[in-house]
Amino acid sequence: MPLVAEVPAAQPLMPVEQALERLLTLAEAAPISDTECVALAHAEGRVLACDLVASLDLPPWPNSAMDGYALRLADLQGEPLPVSQRIFAGHAPAPLQAGTCARIFTGAPMPAGADCVEMQENTQTLEDGRVRFLQALAPAQNVRPQGQETCKGEQVLAKGTRLGPIELGLAASLGHEQLQVVRRARVAVLSTGDELVEPGLPLGPGQIYNSNRRLLVSWLQRLGCEVKDMGILPDDLARTRACLAGLGDVDLILSTGGVSVGEADYLGAALREAGELALWKLAIKPGKPLTFGHYRGVPVIGLPGNPASTLVTFGLLTRPYLLRRQGVCDVTPLRFDVAAGFQWTKAGTRREYLRGRIEGGQVHIYKNQSSGVLRSAAWADGLVEVREGTTPKPGDSVSFIPLSELLG
């Protein structure tokens, strides 16, 4: 497959699945191979660079699952048993004396000779301190055996796993202070367009504030990327060339505002001088135009300029591309079916992603689905996928992708 195969003007629009497949193939051809060792405290969101193998059994010794009494089942002959010791978590017990029981607390190691634990609710303490057991017991009852969770030498996390709170907690439970992770993806973010003004500055005639820059920089940081924020590119070819010349150390150049063939497209002209670009016309709404290519060997993705289009194309296409380059295997966001609480009468030829919110067991859509309305995404908690040629009505099943799946 050519690096930047373009969709000819006369050809059908590229399905979103095909665009994603191409991007993932390109990502796999240019993996980020550099790794580094980081402390668990700084590993949130990073990608594991090698399999994590257990260096010990977990738990490392049999322990009690309950607050209660540890005993030898053979000693339970219907008579109360004296308490020979008290065992707390974090303390080594003495072997259990024959004909006795041990007061034990949750997580405390089992004493040698004991083979079961009775919870304290099923016992009665007599005036002389002996304990009467009120119910029958079975071998190993309420005992967590050594290695119940993990055995030494077992793979517990696979290479390419994104590290979240649960994975970091698991690594800590195995005694790891540091983990080997893939280097952060370095992404340069460029904005183009005479109409863009940075927040805090006065707006001129026909100008708007640059929301896409903040959207993407924040999103990339949440994905664990190292962001090189280049701001708004000037409408000057020489200055644009100079800006691009300093981006040789990044893994991706990400632009918004589109890269065209127009005479005012200084970014496109500068990129084509030392690279290759192609416009993909996608069967997706919002977000039909997507540019992919490379500049001096650095991949380039150009997202459409309308905010909702930027959100959809970054979330569904650019995000998985970046994760795959860092070695993440499963880049598919969770989705589930939910009943539509809306009527959609516009059967289109493109896959539509409506901004919606689940309320009362149904998904409702924002009143204005224009690609320029970012407020629709702030109101929503997910994207409603409307497949080509379909017109969902209230009660129909539609596919829903939570925004939380895309943003993190």
Residue ranges of predicted features:
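Short glycine-rich anion-binding loops that position phosphate/pyrophosphate groups of nucleotides
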Residues: 107-108, 194-195, 258-261, 305
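Phosphate-binding glycine-rich loops and their immediate beta-loop-alpha structural context
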Residues: 142-255
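Flexible glycine/proline-rich
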Residues: 17-20, 34-41, 50, 131, ...
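Phosphate-interaction motifs
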Residues: 2-177, 337
